[in-house]
Regions:
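Small, basic N-terminal interaction modules of short regulatory proteins
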Residues: 1-66
Length: 66
Protein backbone atom coordinates (compact mmCIF):
# COMPACT_ATOMS: atom_id res chain seq x y z
CA UNK A 1 0.00 0.00 0.00
CA UNK A 2 1.18 3.51 -0.68
CA UNK A 3 -0.15 7.01 -0.25
CA UNK A 4 0.71 9.96 -2.47
CA UNK A 5 -0.17 13.61 -1.99
CA UNK A 6 0.22 15.65 -5.17
CA UNK A 7 0.26 19.33 -4.29
CA UNK A 8 0.20 20.40 -7.96
CA UNK A 9 -2.96 18.39 -8.66
CA UNK A 10 -4.39 19.03 -5.18
CA UNK A 11 -5.05 15.31 -4.83
CA UNK A 12 -4.48 12.47 -2.39
CA UNK A 13 -4.16 8.92 -3.73
CA UNK A 14 -4.29 5.62 -1.83
CA UNK A 15 -2.94 2.70 -3.85
CA UNK A 16 -3.93 -0.60 -2.28
CA UNK A 17 -2.46 -2.97 -4.87
CA UNK A 18 -0.04 -2.69 -7.79
CA UNK A 19 -2.35 -4.53 -10.20
CA UNK A 20 -3.08 -2.88 -13.53
CA UNK A 21 -5.95 -0.38 -13.45
CA UNK A 22 -8.58 -1.33 -16.01
CA UNK A 23 -11.41 0.99 -15.01
CA UNK A 24 -11.98 4.13 -12.95
CA UNK A 25 -15.25 5.47 -11.61
CA UNK A 26 -16.08 8.79 -9.99
CA UNK A 27 -18.42 7.66 -7.22
CA UNK A 28 -19.11 11.19 -6.01
CA UNK A 29 -17.67 14.57 -6.97
CA UNK A 30 -13.92 14.45 -6.41
CA UNK A 31 -13.73 10.79 -5.29
CA UNK A 32 -12.47 8.29 -7.86
CA UNK A 33 -12.12 4.52 -7.46
CA UNK A 34 -9.69 2.50 -9.58
CA UNK A 35 -10.50 -1.15 -10.33
CA UNK A 36 -8.42 -4.13 -11.47
CA UNK A 37 -9.45 -6.83 -13.96
CA UNK A 38 -11.34 -8.69 -11.21
CA UNK A 39 -13.36 -5.56 -10.37
CA UNK A 40 -11.53 -5.11 -7.06
CA UNK A 41 -10.84 -1.59 -5.80
CA UNK A 42 -7.09 -1.04 -5.96
CA UNK A 43 -6.93 2.74 -5.67
CA UNK A 44 -8.85 5.67 -4.24
CA UNK A 45 -8.22 9.27 -5.30
CA UNK A 46 -9.52 12.37 -3.55
CA UNK A 47 -9.46 15.53 -5.66
CA UNK A 48 -9.51 18.98 -4.11
CA UNK A 49 -7.84 17.63 -0.99
CA UNK A 50 -6.97 21.12 0.28
CA UNK A 51 -10.72 21.72 0.65
CA UNK A 52 -11.20 18.43 2.53
CA UNK A 53 -8.32 18.52 5.03
CA UNK A 54 -5.97 21.04 6.60
CA UNK A 55 -2.21 21.06 5.96
CA UNK A 56 -1.71 19.87 9.53
CA UNK A 57 -4.02 16.89 9.01
CA UNK A 58 -2.25 15.95 5.79
CA UNK A 59 1.22 16.25 7.33
CA UNK A 60 0.43 13.76 10.11
CA UNK A 61 -1.77 11.02 8.68
CA UNK A 62 -2.77 8.52 11.35
CA UNK A 63 -3.50 4.84 10.79
CA UNK A 64 -5.52 2.42 12.85
CA UNK A 65 -5.56 -1.34 12.61
CA UNK A 66 -8.21 -3.61 14.03
Amino acid sequence: MRIKIDKNSDALYFRLDESRIVESEEIRPGVILDYDKDNRVIGVEFLGISQRATKEELSSLQFQTA
